[in-house]
């Protein structure tokens, strides 16, 4: 079995290409989920202030027998905290029981309140101080990203966006790549695979490779060069989602999955959300 792949970000830092997402997990659930994830080989955990489970993540990491330098921990600046990124980060670090973050992401642009450029400037300062190794954004459209770059000169290393076979965001993914921004997929299985796992091409590939539909979709993300963070609190699923290193999809198979794109957004519209 091949080793889990690592992605080098434009700032020189590296991160695992596959991590565990913990959206909707309670503080109790997340402890068991992370314990299982570390056991099967995950080293990247993606949480957020808005998930209200940073304390559980912190407890799980504290109890883990994995060295801190082997872990890649992400949390996110919530919309209400865009005017106070320093305080928000310090609160997150305290809950996570960490001295530094590997990746700090601005959760949404919230153009209605228009604080995202100033929030980004605050995040740049936090990176310079060493409190975070890398900084990026979530749910930013091209015009939001361009404004950050134009007004600060600092490009996010990550843009974490809704991305799955029904919502492939190829234009944004390509723009990110042109600007050396790594695209990361949230809701990578389209919220449990509805409308995806039952697609003929997904089922045929699952049969061909002896894999589950979820494993086929995760492998699609990996083979498209995306960082991917499937969410689960079920031990068997956590293990299943990581067992994707012993096969690859070929160019034609990736092309067939590309045909599933409907531009079907399951989450909020970044131009409208918040405020």
Swiss-Prot record:
Monomer. PROSITE patterns: ALDOKETO_REDUCTASE_1, ALDOKETO_REDUCTASE_2, ALDOKETO_REDUCTASE_3. It comes from Salmonella typhimurium (strain LT2 / SGSC1412 / ATCC 700720). It catalyses: hydroxyacetone + NADP(+) = methylglyoxal + NADPH + H(+). It is found in: Cytoplasm. It comes from the Bacteria. One of its GO terms (molecular function) is aldose reductase (NADPH) activity. NADP(+) binds at residues 187-241. The active site is at residue 51. GO terms for cellular component: cytosol. Its EC number is 1.1.1.-. Belongs to the aldo/keto reductase family. This is Methylglyoxal reductase DkgA. Substrate binds at residue 107. Aldo-keto reductase that significantly contributes to cellular methylglyoxal detoxification by catalyzing the NADPH-dependent conversion of methylglyoxal to acetol. One of its GO terms (biological process) is L-ascorbic acid biosynthetic process. The keyword Lyase does not apply. Gene3D superfamilies: NADP-dependent oxidoreductase domain. Keywords: Cytoplasm, NADP, Oxidoreductase. It is an enzyme of class 1 (oxidoreductase). NCBIfam families: PRK11565.1. The gene is dkgA.
